[in-house]
Amino acid sequence: MHDAPQNATTIQTEPTTAHTAQTEATVKPEVIQPVPADEEFVKVSTYIPDILVDLRYSTDHNFTGQTVYDFNELWLRYGTVKKLISVQKELKGRGLCLKIWDGFRPPSAQFKLWDICPDPIYVSNPNNGFSSHSRGNTVDVTLAYPDGTELSMPTGFDDFSKLADRDYSDCDQEAAANAMLLEKVMQDCGFKPYSGEWWHFTDTRSYPVEHTFQPITATLYYADCSEYISLRTKPSTAADVIARISAGEQFRVLAHSDQFALIEYDNLFGYVLKDYIQPVE
């Protein structure tokens, strides 16, 4: 029996043989995390643990002075993350690393950004089309040393002056050289630069705007079921099961996707039905 609340009047059962049930009760098999598809959203730090992340829109340290989204982990499409792995490897050979200021920005965050600053000079109007950040394949980045110290660049993040574009003739030589190095490495690894912002790069592979995946600040939940819930590779009841979470066991919810929640459980990432989980109080 699984995926059913404790107070449900009808409990669905998952067919198992007696031998299988006995094996699962006594032996915990080794489980290998499946490799995500390129279009799947993943937590970037899982795949690039030494990358530096400073999500400006998760705080008030941005041009609006307000918090735009309430999660503090960087999320991107897995295909984009694979390219960032190559970027980070190249930079590490130079004693540098990437520092990321913004990644996936849900459409809800784009609407909030527009509400705060309804000026198309500064913010993409979501009523006319979403920012590429809402596709999960775009990053705002800079160069830094491993200790977090940022290199000199033409401007700071979200500077709206002419100095922010990719005409580096109007900034000092050191800043220009650093910006050109960042641009070259990103392009070599499969990103295209935006001419108006030296920090803005988009994966050359396009993805659709993502309307259902909604990251949250990681929150502790437990399995609210009679026996167990299934941890699946994708947000679908037809997806493969990679683990079973016993009733009462706890895990971290990282994001919501329609009727599913993306969770982290026992060093695995997968999806469970939201109807059968409850927050730990």
Language model: regions and residue ranges:
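Extracytoplasmic cell-surface/polysaccharide-interacting catalytic and binding patches
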Residues: 2-7, 11-101, 113-196, 202-219
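Short, solvent-exposed loop/turn elements at domain surfaces
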Residues: 62-66, 230-233, 261
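Short alpha-helix capping/helix-loop boundary micro-motifs
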Residues: 235-240
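SH3/SH3-like beta-barrel fold
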Residues: 248, 261-265
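A short macromolecule-binding patch
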Residues: 266-277
